[in-house]
Structure formats: structure tokens, C-alpha cells
Amino acid sequence: MQGKIIKSLAGFYYVESEGQVYQTRARGNFRKRGETPYVGDIVDFSAEDNSEGYILAIHPRKNSLVRPPIVNIDQAVVIMSAKEPEFNSNLLDRFLILLEHKAIHPVVYISKMDLLDSPEEIKAIGRQYQAIGYDFVTSLEELLPLLADKITVFMGQTGVGKSTLLNRIAPELALEIGEISDSLGRGRHTTRAVSFYNTHGGKIADTPGFSSLDYDIANAEDLNEAFPELRRLSHECKFRSCTHTHEPKCAVKAALETGELWPVRYEHYLQFLSEIENRRETYKKVIKRK
């Protein structure tokens, strides 16, 4: 039999197959090979009615995220608050390059719009992201249709209202709502283990996790690929390995001068590139010491 792991709890894996859910365990040979089944895995398994089954094989994964681990994701809703905490395009772009690198479709959702005196600034920013090709929504009514036929996870800085949003999408989840700490301006972690939940024609992960940014982009080429607008323009650069910093006849810098490219995104690209290069230099120094 073949199915999808929709929940993992205390060593048991709950596999959905043809409308039924089976409780299974992983055979010991997975541990010997250093393999662990995760929520989202497509697996082959054996199970009889009303009895414990066993996972026999894990199919190749198209992508994965960590903390909590979840695999084979179709899209991720990146939740950014308009206020408390303040909207941060640099942080948003960090989430976006993580998702681009993992081949996960991003959807940007702006929470707490009601706290703004005027929504125009956020809407103007939204138009810039939409021009790149991203879904950028500011209401639940805009978000819900995007969940159909997709496996969706939710990510965002602590305190942006991840639990609140999930409770609005599926009230039966009854996720604990975090509070904003007055002293820190940051939310407290109030999430739990991951599992899938059927809602609005798709599946969502019932955890507002993924507030950490563990992206493994290690070079300029990968970073370029993680910026869709740079990726499209870079085919017109004179040099194939153009980093869009100092090279002549760079299509990205030309687009910046003509106003075709949003300067904010280019500034973030340069900052992230500098961080990658600094990490590489630090790594080289550590290796030399050894």
C-alpha cells in the first residue's frame, strides 16, 4: 500500500491512504540506515484493518524544512505583520530566498493591517512583490482560495499572529495564541508538534512553526537563483557567472539604472551576498587553524 504521513507522534506515524488513516511504525532498518520518516513523506506500508502497520519504504522527497521537520511541501505562507512587530522587508526576503532555494512556492500574507493608520505604504510594497511574481495578500478572503489542492505550511517571525491566522482558517484547531511580550516586543513560543489538517480543499500544517531561517545558500549562483527577477535578467549579462556587483555589461545593474529593478531587493541581494562571502572566509580561517 502507498500513502502519505499526515502525523507523527511518540514513535507512531499516521498514514493516510485512500480515505483511511493507518497507525504505523518504522521498521528498525530505517534507523540502521540513518533514515527517519517525516510528516509529508510518501511511503509504502503494510497494514491490516484495525492493526498496527509498518512503513516499508520512503519515496524520494521534493523538498524539506526543519524545526519541525516536514517534507514534500507545495507552498508556504510567509506571515509578516504590518505592525507589532513592524513590517521588515529584509526579513521577508530572507524567508523568500529560503523558499525559492527549497523549491517551495511562497505566499506573502500581511497580518494586523487594522493597526495601520493608512494601508497605502504596505499596498505599495505589495505591488512591488506582485510585479516580481509573488502572491501578496492582506486579507483572509484573499488567502483561502490559495489553499485549495495544496499542502501548505506557515512561517514567520514570532509574534506576527501565526496561531491567530490558523485559528481563523480552521477554528477547530484551537491553537494556543501567543502574547506579545511588552518588554521585548517579541512573541512567546506557543507551538506544538506538526501534523496535517484538511481544510478549504487542501492540507495545512497545524503548527505555526518555522520562525528560524536555516538556509544553505553557499554561493552567488544559488543566491542569484533565489531572486526570480535577478534570475530572469542574468541571462542577458555578458558573463555567465556575473555576481551583479562589479562586472561590465551586467543586465541586473542596467535594470537598476532604468528603474526596472526594485532597488530594495537589489540592496538585500548585496547584503546577503556579503554575508555568504563572510561565512566562507570564516570557514576558511577555521580550516586553516585545524
From Swiss-Prot:
PROSITE patterns in UniProt: ENGC_GTPASE (PS50936), G_CP (PS51721)
GO-annotated cellular components: cytoplasm
UniProt keyword Cytoplasm present: yes
Keywords recorded for this protein, A-Z: Cytoplasm, GTP-binding, Hydrolase, Metal-binding, Nucleotide-binding, Ribosome biogenesis, RNA-binding, rRNA-binding, Zinc
E.C. designation(s): 3.6.1.-
CDD domains, per database record: S1_YloQ_GTPase, YjeQ_EngC
Compartment(s) where it occurs, according to its Swiss-Prot or TrEMBL record: Cytoplasm
Cofactor requirement: Zn(2+)
Residues annotated to bind Zn(2+): 237, 242, 244, 250
Gene3D superfamilies recorded: Nucleic acid-binding proteins, P-loop containing nucleotide triphosphate hydrolases, Probable gtpase engc, domain 3
GO molecular function: GTP binding; GTPase activity; metal ion binding; rRNA binding
Enzyme class: hydrolase
SUPFAM superfamilies tied to this protein: Nucleic acid-binding proteins, P-loop containing nucleoside triphosphate hydrolases
GO biological process terms held by the UniProt record: ribosomal small subunit biogenesis
Pfam families: RsgA_GTPase (PF03193), RsgA_N (PF16745)
Family: Belongs to the TRAFAC class YlqF/YawG GTPase family. RsgA subfamily.
Stored PANTHER family: SMALL RIBOSOMAL SUBUNIT BIOGENESIS GTPASE RSGA, SMALL RIBOSOMAL SUBUNIT BIOGENESIS GTPASE RSGA 1, MITOCHONDRIAL-RELATED
Protein name: Small ribosomal subunit biogenesis GTPase RsgA
Naturally occurring in which organism (per UniProt): Streptococcus pyogenes serotype M1
Designated gene of the protein: rsgA
